[in-house]
Amino acid sequence: MSNITKKAFPVLNMHCAGCANNVEKTVKKLAGVVDASVNFATNTLSVSYEADKLTPGEIRAAVLAAGYDLIVEEALKEERQEEAQEKHYRLLKRQVIGAWIFVVPMLLFSMVLMHVPFSNEIQLILALPVMIFFGGSFYVNAWRQARLERSNMDTLVALSTSIAFLFSVFNTFFPEFWYSRGLEPHVYYEAAVVIIAFVLTGKLMEERAKGNTSTAIRKLMGLQPRVARVLREGIEEDILIDQLQTGDLVVVRPGEQIPVDGRLSEGESYVDESMISGEPIPVEKKVGDRVLAGTINQKGAFVIKASGVGSETVLARIIRMVQEAQGSKAPVQRIVDRVTGIFVPVVLCIAVLTFVIWLLVGGTDYFSHALLSAVSVLVIACPCALGLATPTALMVGIGKAASNHILIKDAVALEQMRKVDVVVLDKTGTLTEGHPTVSGWLWAQVQEEHFKNVLLAAELKSEHPLAGAIVSSLQEVEKIVPAQLESFESITGKGIKVVYQGDTYWVGSHKLLKDFSASLSDVLAEMMVQYESDGNSIVYFGRGTEVLAVVAIADQIKPTSAEAVKELKRQGIDICMLTGDGQRTALAVSGKLGIDRFVADALPDDKEEFVRELQMQGKTVAMVGDGINDSQALALADVSIAMGKGTDIAMDVAMVTLMTSDLLLLPRAFELSKQTVKLIHQNLFWAFIYNLIGIPIAAGILFPVNGLLLNPMLASAAMAFSSVSVVLNSLSLARK
């Protein structure tokens, strides 16, 4: 297999979990499809397919043949889906109002005026508009599925109401059939139309509630401007956002949303990036600085050279990531899918069995009892409650996480997070600000003129975070000019060595001292101990076997780190800190934060090995880092959590991304995962219990005990309430 493409398409005309199952089966049968899944809550098909064997148009054709539709055009896809859903909601609203206009007088005739002349005929006339105009879609959809040898909730509604209606029509025009057998001919028009009215009402409430579950993603989409102002041949021109191209010059005025990712080519301003990074203070932007789509220009006008447009912006990636996460399936969903796949056929069998048993043991009213019980079984059964249980909880949980600047990759990550019992934190950039500065220098007694030039040149070539602090101090503060080096070599996990005018110089951690057989003078050693005891990181600079300088580098602990550690402990999670710094520095930092366990002098391989050791002890490990010196440990951990501001490549590979530098997001993420998974289990429990209890009661299992026989009208109300209650329960998470 080659050229695998993964895409998500909005699905139209789905009415229940059975519909979602049918669409999924249809797409999976297509040649070239690697995998497909349908999320009923989001009305989305996620499909991986071989692009050289299949096109989106062919996928849509197959879905159309199954009675549904796809939006495959990329342009304004979300807007078209929202428009279709709004149109469907308005149609449902008209159907509900129209149905109840006829149902209310129908109930009057069936319960109060049943003895007036032509009561049955009047009820028939009132029932016809409900059956044909307002509930007609149930029969059309059920027939379409039957032709494909499939079934869904429409099948149950169509069968139950048709049986009640046709039986009533027969009794209206041929009452003698029953009179001749000494029986009273009953009509159940009210049952048929009330079932339709209740089901439509339930669907209307369900659609409204489902719409509320996608609030977070709509807010993110609202950050995308529709129009951009481009500069072409010196003339400003307004164009649609999807017409922008990489390299375009985009003009942004004060108060406007930035439409593209790019860098300032003219002007300067302050930009509000809180919607992306969560940082509340506007960030100063000058020529050459990067800006992101969706952020807001505060003051001056400027021109951006676009580097990311449309689906390539950071905002678009965030939206795509949240959508994919909301559309992913929790491990437990596989069981639910199997149940919903056979649900309707099983219910049909139970209804037939109920009818037969009542005919055999039903007594004098055997036929009416058999009919009503079979109809009640068909009506009360609800695959929608099962189908909505997991995806609605995921939508709300992952959406709430996104609104809190926490990006969760998928449902599996959410499930894994609640099992975590050890969090491993990389010190630099995670517990600390990640903006190291030189806090002290101590040079050996003999300092040659070119030493700082060599040190600057070496650190300019280094990728280590601490190198930037030395570069800033020498280049920007002391205005040192870098020397011309003859060679450069990186020593993994230790530092670097360079050659200048035939001499070998080295910069790095204390591990390099052993490599070069170098030792500290008493003065340098004493100062090094003082620096480390204050929590500073130490960088050594030497030539051959001689240590030339000790540089102390401070990286301030984040204001929220100690509180985050305390909150994680409250949740029962053990915490370990990993750092490449020495023992004294690690002890000083861990003491300030209340972390009991740490590993100092840790190389990237050591961090990976530490995570592996924890896993061998049976621990579920979450690794939190910035992806610089901890990528191996992040990859190995059960849950990988990246610290970033939405611009990191770590966002693509980590299971969870904290979009701001606030470490309090970490315990919040774990809390949200536990709440969401708990909600999924609650929803599934009640959905299963509802069907396990409701179907036997509808079949008449309590009749021998207390004479209770469930009216089909009450059964339809219970069915409508079951799926609505699942969605409302999911929405309760948004209020926590």
Segments predicted by a language model, with ranges:
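Conserved ATP-binding TGD loop and adjacent catalytic N/P-domain core of P-type ATPases
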Residues: 4, 21, 500-502, 542-682
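Flexible metal-binding regulatory segments at protein termini and peripheral loops
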Residues: 1-122, 219, 235, 316, ...
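Conserved catalytic phosphorylation-site environment of P-type ATPases
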Residues: 276, 372, 382-458, 614, ...
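Transmembrane helix-loop-helix hairpins at the membrane interface
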Residues: 91-227, 338, 441, 710
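Membrane-embedded alpha-helical bundles of multi-pass transporters
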Residues: 112-115, 147, 166, 400, ...
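Signature of the cytosolic headpiece of P-type E1-E2 ATPases
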Residues: 466, 475-588, 603
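Juxtamembrane coupling segments of multi-pass membrane pumps/enzymes
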Residues: 8, 80, 179, 193-254, ...
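Conserved cytosolic catalytic loops of P-type ATPases
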Residues: 32-53, 57, 189, 218-312, ...
